[in-house]
Amino acid sequence: MTNSTHFGFTTVSETEKARKVAEVFHSVAARYNLMNDLMSMGLHRLWKRFAIDVSGAKPGDKVLDIAGGTADLTRLFLEKTGSTGEVWLTDINNSMLSIGRDRMLNDGKSVPVAQCDAEKLPFPDNYFDRVCVAFGLRNMTHKDAALREMWRVLSPGGSLIVLEFSKVWKPLQPLYDTYSFKALPFMGKIVARDDTSYRYLAESIRMHPSQEELKQLMQQAGFERVEYFNLTAGVVALHRGYKF
């Protein structure tokens, strides 16, 4: 019997969710960066810079960028780790990963790339100093399993950074809902010729755990000293936890 889960507001089988999420990112990959700039009015660049700073990445670190897609975080981590570091770009979606890899090569930078499932990471225990997942955990079916895998591959003293859409400050909720369910699909239709994927984005944000719930999930996976930072009134939250 196949277990059920949610794809946005719709209940589907786990197999169907994996297929539908893959279809979303195959569809939006080509215009992904442009849509990020439009949807966030460029704020996503500041959120990602903040994530890098909070990660504590330093020269020589081994870093795993999960759901790294178009390599925004990978590029920023390289600035911190330098020539003695090792930054892996990974994603479950080949369309996204190909764009990220090509962007790196166009910049004259080569990093190891792997297409893999965050719930079954192909890396040894205690290997990475930093693990980061930005705007990817929301789409994972078994978030608890993925977080346990992130804990497994971190070396003692290492940190996990989770950057993700979260629960907005309540007084802003009506305005945010209007923007999410009206403006985002409209922009998706005009720019990416795909309103359905951006409707899923709005729905998936509502189904994602709250700031406190995600903190608890990270603690249950083994992370310690877990804390979070609300960015842009909680539109996005950055969680950080350590492995000791």
UniProtKB/Swiss-Prot annotation:
* Pathway(s) per entry: Quinol/quinone metabolism; menaquinone biosynthesis; menaquinol from 1,4-dihydroxy-2-naphthoate: step 2/2; Cofactor biosynthesis; ubiquinone biosynthesis
The entry's family comment says:
Belongs to the class I-like SAM-binding methyltransferase superfamily. MenG/UbiE family.
Concerning HAMAP family, the annotation shows: MenG_UbiE_methyltr
Q: Which UniProt keywords apply?
A: Menaquinone biosynthesis, Methyltransferase, S-adenosyl-L-methionine, Transferase, Ubiquinone biosynthesis
Recorded protein name is: Ubiquinone/menaquinone biosynthesis C-methyltransferase UbiE
What is this protein's gene name? ubiE
Q: Its function? A: Methyltransferase required for the conversion of demethylmenaquinol (DMKH2) to menaquinol (MKH2) and the conversion of 2-polyprenyl-6-methoxy-1,4-benzoquinol (DDMQH2) to 2-polyprenyl-3-methyl-6-methoxy-1,4-benzoquinol (DMQH2).
User: What Enzyme Commission number(s) appear in the record?
Assistant: 2.1.1.163, 2.1.1.201
Q: Which reaction does it catalyse?
A: a 2-demethylmenaquinol + S-adenosyl-L-methionine = a menaquinol + S-adenosyl-L-homocysteine + H(+); a 2-methoxy-6-(all-trans-polyprenyl)benzene-1,4-diol + S-adenosyl-L-methionine = a 5-methoxy-2-methyl-3-(all-trans-polyprenyl)benzene-1,4-diol + S-adenosyl-L-homocysteine + H(+)
Q: Give the originating organism.
A: Nitrosomonas europaea (strain ATCC 19718 / CIP 103999 / KCTC 2705 / NBRC 14298)
Any Gene Ontology biological process: aerobic respiration
Taxonomy of origin reads: Bacteria, Pseudomonadati, Pseudomonadota, Betaproteobacteria, Nitrosomonadales
Q: Which InterPro entries match?
A: SAM-dependent_MTases_sf, UbiE/COQ5_MeTrFase, UbiE/COQ5_MeTrFase_CS
Please give the Gene Ontology molecular function terms for this protein. 2-methoxy-6-polyprenyl-1,4-benzoquinol methyltransferase activity; demethylmenaquinone methyltransferase activity
Q: Where does S-adenosyl-L-methionine bind?
A: T70, D91, D117, A118
Identify the PANTHER family for this entry: 2-METHOXY-6-POLYPRENYL-1,4-BENZOQUINOL METHYLASE, MITOCHONDRIAL, METHYLTRANSFERASE
